[in-house]
Structures are given as C-alpha cells and as structure tokens.
Amino acid sequence: MKKTTDAELSILVVDDDENIRMVLHQSLEKEGYHVSTAKNAEEALNTLQRSFFHVVITDIMMGEMSGVELLQQIKEMNSLMQIFVMTSHSTLPNVIQCMQGGAYDFFEKPLKIEDVLISLGEASRRAARWSTLYS
C-alpha cells in the first residue's frame, strides 16, 4: 500500500480573505501540496462533498457561517478529517472551543508559513498511519 507523503497531501483552504487564500495556495503548492480554495463555509462544504481532502485549513471568523460551525459540520461528515483553524482574533475561548471540537491545530494571523508546514508534515504522517489501517 502506497503511503501518503507530504507532497500527496490534498488541502482545502477556506477563508473569506482572498489575499490569505492566495498566499496559502501559492506557498503550499510551491511545497508540492495539492491545494484547492473556498471563499466561505458553504463553498467549502460543497467542495468537500465532491472531492476528498486530507486537510482543511479554515478561518474561524467568516460571514454567514463561522469556522467553528464549519469544523463541526466537517467532523460530522468525516470524523478523521484533519482541520486546522486560523484567526486574527485568537482568544483562549476560541482556541479551547476549536480544539475540543476536533481541530488538529490552531494558527494565529498573520500566519507563519513555517509553522503551517511543520503541522502539515505531522498531518501527513498521521494520514499515512490511517491509510495503513484502512488498506
């Protein structure tokens, strides 16, 4: 069974800020990841119903549906989905709520791409372990 490597990891980036989506998309593709983007939670859920992703990176503070609500809906669809949350309004209650809700990791904006890459490496190893269990 072929293991998931970092470069094979598929990632969905969800943020209502086009600049954040663009920077993450370009930075992660440059590292060899397969990256798609969504501008809001509804678009993300539609994309997740059509395509498989190993990881979702989502903003917490978005318009019609928060990243916390998106996190909950994704976990209902796929409890093993690795979800990273990011926000410029990080408060302890936000962090606790997301981590208790099943977030894999939490990032503060402005993002440090190095931190994201380290966490994605860990997520890739975790995805590889899960794939061996289900092969």
Q: How would you describe each model-predicted region?
A:
Residues 21, 63-64, 87, 91:
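The feature encodes the CheY-like receiver
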Residues 46, 68-80, 97-100:
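Short amphipathic alpha-helix used as the core "switch/output" element in two-component signaling
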Residues 91-93, 111-121:
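C-terminal output helix
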Residues 51-57:
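Active-site beta3 strand of CheY-like receiver
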